[in-house]
């Protein structure tokens, strides 16, 4: 039985959690959404300062919630890549300090590997191989999960990530930040077939389309042109219908690629991770399509779809059980491929 305290500060959530194997003992998430709303997005310098102000209290809360002493903690982990460099440094430095102070092993964890492991928090018996659909504000990828630390990217977005597209369309419609939840809410009362929008296929040099890669920039532009035309005609914007049509288009595009990828590679399980995994439209499309194709789809609990430290701790537990630890000199990286996860360990 391995107990890990993990810290996640890659973007705008200050999160600390303690996990025993795949059981969450405590999970603290201090969101900065209200801080960044006035700017319409995350401001890196503001995020770093907010992490500094919150991190010590979050660690204390996590320890209190778990009702554990430091003697019961086996290792300390923190997200080290990818993410905002200043934000990552706050969490990584705090984790290293705790590891040195309490003489514990230290592990750096890849943020996207954490999102893969979020599914394990509700499905502790899940075993590779399976297909991971990672959909967040910064990443949209189809990942072949072979085992802990071994990942192969099979498809990705060529431009905007799914979550980024939601934020940009919400900004275009003057709905505020973050865009995902508000578009999802509006879409509940809208007509998803009101407007035909492009799914964003990626052409191949020899003709045809890439089966697993996608693009959301064209979809975003199509919504912009739709809004401009409606305003030019003097029509009021049917926000619910636009939201529903946009959300359905994103969900259909992601679902088609995920299903095709799983079937082509003989994988019977699709595990979805990242903030967009909370989207009701995506969940409905994937559940229907997987059932029709005799596949299984798994989602993390809603509270573990967005950034959290429990998923980071869960990944660290698996690495530690394999004898993996990180050097205390490990730094942060704004970009790091999932295929390079093992460079974090010694």
UniProtKB/Swiss-Prot annotation:
E.C. designation(s): 2.3.1.234
GO CC, alphabetical: cytoplasm
Enzyme class, UniProt record, top EC level: transferase
Main location group: cytoplasm
Disulphide-bonded residues: none
Residues that, per the record, bind substrate: 134-138, 167, 180, 184, 279
Binding site for Fe cation: 111, 115, 307
Task performed by this protein: Required for the formation of a threonylcarbamoyl group on adenosine at position 37 (t(6)A37) in tRNAs that read codons beginning with adenine. Is involved in the transfer of the threonylcarbamoyl moiety of threonylcarbamoyl-AMP (TC-AMP) to the N6 group of A37, together with TsaE and TsaB. TsaD likely plays a direct catalytic role in this reaction.
Membership in a protein family: Belongs to the KAE1 / TsaD family.
Descriptive protein name: tRNA N6-adenosine threonylcarbamoyltransferase
Organism: Nostoc sp. (strain PCC 7120 / SAG 25.82 / UTEX 2576)
